[in-house]
Amino acid sequence: GRHPLIWALALGLESTASTFFYMDAHADTGEIVSQRELPISYEDDATSLYHKVMNVAVDQLEEIMNDLEKNMLQKIPQEIGGGNVWRKRGKRDGEIDWRMSSRAIYNLVRALTKPYVGAHFVYQDQEIKVWKVREIITKEYDYIEPGKVLSVTGQMGYRIKAGDNVIELVQCEPVHMEIGEYL
């Protein structure tokens, strides 16, 4: 499918896979020649997951080449409808909706961080790119509406009420917001 690493992170999956397969007439349906599952940790982002997959893929390629050389490459048919085929992502898919859960926002940001386009929110008609956030699990602000700027931490850090908890902006484009404002 399209954007498999981004989708795996954005959906909060606990694992993904590196798969080599023969091309055929349909999307991602050819016979599999190598597949390795990889765990996705809470700390993983687009960059770290990409490196994990690439490291495994290098090992897989060596094994595939050795098996080809020995004429021992095994092909495994894929189950019809057994894999995930995700749709193409658009710009709106990267927009932070503060009504989302803190985990969903965290997952969205880590999925779209550099080298990708970044998650974003709109403040005073300006798109603000967000590269890293921290999830703060607390019941202290349960009765505050999502999107409220709760506090300023350091030079650029803001704590913002999410649907269920709090999100701290750790790394984002420069923006000046006031405590009490709503996004």
Identify the residue ranges that each predicted region occupies.
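A short catalytic or substrate-binding loop motif that flags glycine-/basic-rich loops and adjacent residues
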Residues: 12, 88-90, 112-113, 152
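Amphipathic alpha-helical surface "interface" segments used
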Residues: 80-90, 129-130
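Acyl-group handling in specialized metabolite and lipid biosynthesis
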Residues: 87-100
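An anion-binding loop in the catalytic cleft
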Residues: 98-183
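Short glycine/serine/threonine-biased micro-segments
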Residues: 10, 28, 69, 92, ...
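A generic structural signal for alpha->beta connector loops
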Residues: 17, 92, 125-127
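Donor/substrate-binding cores of folate-linked one-carbon enzymes
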Residues: 1-85
